[in-house]
């Protein structure tokens, strides 16, 4: 059973940090679920949409369907316009209810696989159409944006947005490849990356995770890419043995760079010796939405730091 990290701040601040990190982990686990068949009835254009995750909200805005949204999840905080939208509740079943959802009289609900499946039968009983998000890679995000654009009547906007994002991604990956090629005769190499999801016990990201896809597209090599599980528990001994070049820590974890450096034996790591420890915005890394490209871009800059 996952243990809570040691409390090193005030009780109030730690509770907020734990809430953010738990939400982050829930988002990650849900984003790696197997692709499911969602409702494909597109003979209508929804006018009263409820989005139950931050990533879904960002996708709706990205394809131009923001004026059709009647409510969003409490965790939806981007773009800034979401602050003025009514909130339907949190991300999981403990803070969501069918009664609250029905009070907004939606004709379409945007769900996340693995988290909102308990609502499906009830939505069907109330003749409310839905879509189940299950993206586990950037290419999945592009496909989902196209589907949502078509469903909401914004197919052209979705195509334009996806084309633009694909071009942005291509520029990033091309640049990363050029940097590696240019330094082929030097000591430069593809950098090994350790992403710390949790530290008690240690948890990282495997090959089937959304974060692994971001690391690879940025030009890095995930030290746990050999593990199939999306977010496996790993040993500290293995982390030390892998000797990563880069250490990434989610900002919401409350873990400081100094605390990483002070861990027993970690001072021998390349990443620690060369000060290559970074606090990263886990909202970008954990949300399978259009800003995943920003996550790739930010990580590519880190990887290209000499």
Q: What annotation goes with each model-predicted range?
A:
Residues 47, 142-145, 150, 159, ...:
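Structured C-terminal subdomain patch of bacterial secreted/periplasmic proteins
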Residues 53, 113, 197, 227, ...:
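Short secondary-structure boundary segments
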Residues 96-105, 121, 125-126, 234-243:
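Short helices/loops that flank or line small-molecule/ion binding pockets
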Residues 115-125, 246-263:
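A ligand-binding cleft/hinge motif common to bilobed small-molecule-binding domains
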Residues 118, 133-147, 190-210:
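Extracytoplasmic ligand-binding site segments that recognize negatively charged/polar headgroups
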């Amino acid at each position: 059973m996952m243990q809570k990290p040691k409390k090193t701040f005030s009780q109030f601040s730690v509770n907020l940090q734990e809430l953010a990190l738990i939400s982050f982990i829930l988002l990650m686990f849900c984003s790696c679920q197997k692709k499911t068949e969602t409702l494909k009835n597109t003979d209508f254009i929804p006018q009263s949409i409820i989005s139950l995750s931050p990533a879904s909200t960002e996708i709706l805005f990205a394809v131009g369907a923001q004026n059709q949204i009647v409510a969003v999840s409490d965790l939806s905080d981007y773009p800034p316009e979401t602050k003025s939208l009514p909130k339907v509740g949190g991300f999981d079943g403990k803070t969501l209810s069918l009664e609250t959802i029905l009070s907004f009289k939606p004709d379409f609900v945007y769900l996340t696989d693995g988290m909102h499946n308990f609502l499906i039968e009830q939505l069907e009983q109330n003749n409310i159409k839905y879509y189940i998000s299950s993206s586990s890679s950037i290419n999945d995000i592009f496909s989902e944006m196209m589907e949502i654009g078509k469903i909401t009547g914004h197919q052209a906007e979705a195509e334009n947005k996806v084309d633009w994002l694909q071009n942005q991604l291509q520029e990033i990956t091309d640049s990363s490849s050029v940097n590696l090629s240019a330094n082929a005769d030097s000591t430069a190499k593809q950098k090994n990356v350790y992403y710390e999801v949790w530290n008690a016990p240690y948890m990282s990201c495997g090959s089937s995770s959304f974060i692994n896809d971001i690391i690879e597209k940025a030009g890095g090599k995930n030290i746990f890419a050999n593990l199939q599980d999306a977010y496996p528990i790993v040993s500290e001994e293995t982390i030390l043995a892998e000797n990563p070049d880069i250490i990434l820590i989610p900002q919401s974890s409350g873990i400081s760079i100094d605390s990483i450096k002070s861990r027993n034996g970690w001072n021998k790591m390349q990443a620690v010796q060369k000060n290559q420890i970074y606090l990263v915005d886990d909202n970008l890394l954990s949300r399978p939405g259009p800003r995943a490209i920003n996550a790739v871009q930010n990580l590519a800059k880190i990887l290209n730091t000499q």
